[in-house]
């Protein structure tokens, strides 16, 4: 055992042992409690960054701790391998996306191995492998057969740079989430999965996720956006269809002075066909920003279509406007405008000098309608037969009236829209459908799956290369045998990441999407990833899990029992990025200090949920601590080996009750730290685990070894310390555990048990304050009387109370504090 800590040698030795023993390969064991720990699998960009290091170390620490508790632990890893960056690299560098992706995976896998993460590599999944996406295609066909998949023309979010459709969730402040380009509105034929059919369950089952952050659950509630309201029907002059309007405030119906439709509403297009100015307005809105945050602040613009609707109660005509603040994907793409009682409608009415009709009277307050809209509830006025009703009552009465007259109905509305999964790109899972002029849409037969991406394609940077590949497109219809075309769209990459966690459980299964192993391992017990996935990946995965449950593939209702959302890694107060020049290279960090130092720092520097501020001095401090632990262990190696031999031979018994007081006191501290650290591990508070380990080490390194019992105490304490540190710094703990003669490998050692008798103590440390200021400390017996404690306090604080009158002595038992009040 070298005197000097050499992390590279230590880490290579530990990793070779784990590889040789296949330490982290796991199988199902019904006699053990299972624990499935999973960090969101990475996109193979080519290199790990410090955010990766933090995220995957968090998962590894949890997995190793749960294993030490005796559970059957699965921690797999894989690659979310499809996506635009690979295709963009193909365009830029003239390299096939598959080749670029495989090269990146190899580089990142090497980095993961150097970090020492306890992965079951035999379960490694790469989503661009046909054996993976084959089952995604198979499942999509099952959903199609159930009526949960459909294709229709829809106005979509079009990214003009990436030349593809984006889901609503992929539009951030009006821009594409990857390219940053301003998103345009475009009508295109798209594939959808009916996530709205599961909206109620997706909402209600959030209540069962007790171990999810409240913020994430609220974000999903808001995104699903359930509201109870009324659908109102407006007949339109010289137009064949009624306009359907959804509102949560039917009590304001009598105050409607105009209607507004979205720029891509069929009525707007009808109006534009006969009105040049309307068409010009629609053209000017083509690049409209569609994020709700943008809508709240952008200029409200519109134009009168010249068409009118009939008020369903009064029969009066209302003008119909096209407005840029109405979105087709929310509600029906049309709104009832009540300027007196909706601020947005009021602003629009002021701009275009439209009527403002008050129909709600505020209760006990005055309101100036020349300044703003009154948006709260009140008493109805100017509402004919509904006058004098409270808003709460009027909502029901007016809804009933509309239902009786076939002019509306009570309804539940959702903000959530069906999931558009079509992407007009090459590097994704081919959608397994065939379009035949004779038969329409025909699924690819199961025996012809997977539909594999062709390799003989050209990457021009515009549109989908698949549309230009005749060998791929031109097929025979499996139903009628006539010439047909293969679907050239590929899946949104969120489809692959919506079920990968279940496939990890039964990697290698060639005859089914999932098998009974998925039922054993799911749900994932601990999932780790960023909060930015709250309304994309996490919602889609919950939806997919319910789809798989209803297909009989899994038993549970939810995919992830507990969720940990880690904070970002910052440097100089900013997120690390190449453009800011504040990136820390994990390879350099590991080469300089070792993986254990990197792991220790990212666990110690901040609680997991909070942002971590990078600190070079913090890294050096973590490294110094590990060097001290190594040096101490080396210094006492022979003694510790002898004690181990005694214990293994059955001669290592110590009666701790008979030990001297200083040993009892130190042992009390060690087991206090053990109890607290175990509690902190259970709460994922790893920063306080590390601080506890540092306190424990300081306690034993300062301890004077004088008796045989002292040696056993040091042995017991170093055993506890190494096991507490092992999930966080596994390499150094593995080597020290072996070199100090402990039984088995530390990866197989049980979690240390708290000796409750050690937590009991005969003595208590007290602090003495004089007029609230700390002046002294002393130790007293646990059964000392108040008089004895006060006398001891006066004695130890003598220099501060001499020549003063002690007016009062206050003992605070639970804080071990005595305050002397002097005059």
Curated annotation (Swiss-Prot):
InterPro entries cross-referenced by the UniProt entry: aa-tRNA-synth_I_CS, aa-tRNA-synth_Ia, Leu-tRNA-ligase, Leu_tRNA-synth_edit, M/V/L/I-tRNA-synth_anticd-bd, Methionyl/Leucyl_tRNA_Synth, Rossmann-like_a/b/a_fold, tRNAsynth_Ia_anticodon-bd
Positions of short motif 'HIGH' region: 42-52
Amino acids binding ATP: 578
Species this chain originates from: Legionella pneumophila (strain Paris)
CDD domains reported in the protein's UniProt record: Anticodon_Ia_Leu_BEm, LeuRS_core
Protein name: Leucine--tRNA ligase
EC number: 6.1.1.4
Residues spanning the signal sequence: none
Gene Ontology cellular component terms for the protein in this record: cytosol
Residue positions of motif 'KMSKS' region: 575-579
Catalysis performed (reactions): tRNA(Leu) + L-leucine + ATP = L-leucyl-tRNA(Leu) + AMP + diphosphate
Key words, A-Z: Aminoacyl-tRNA synthetase, ATP-binding, Cytoplasm, Ligase, Nucleotide-binding, Protein biosynthesis
Main location (coarse class): cytoplasm
GO molecular-function terms, A-Z: aminoacyl-tRNA deacylase activity; ATP binding; leucine-tRNA ligase activity
Recorded family membership: Belongs to the class-I aminoacyl-tRNA synthetase family.
One GO term of the biological process aspect: leucyl-tRNA aminoacylation
Subcellular localization, as worded in the UniProt entry: Cytoplasm
NCBIfam families (alphabetical): leuS_bact
Gene3D superfamilies: 3.10.20.590, HUPs, Isoleucyl-tRNA Synthetase, Domain 1
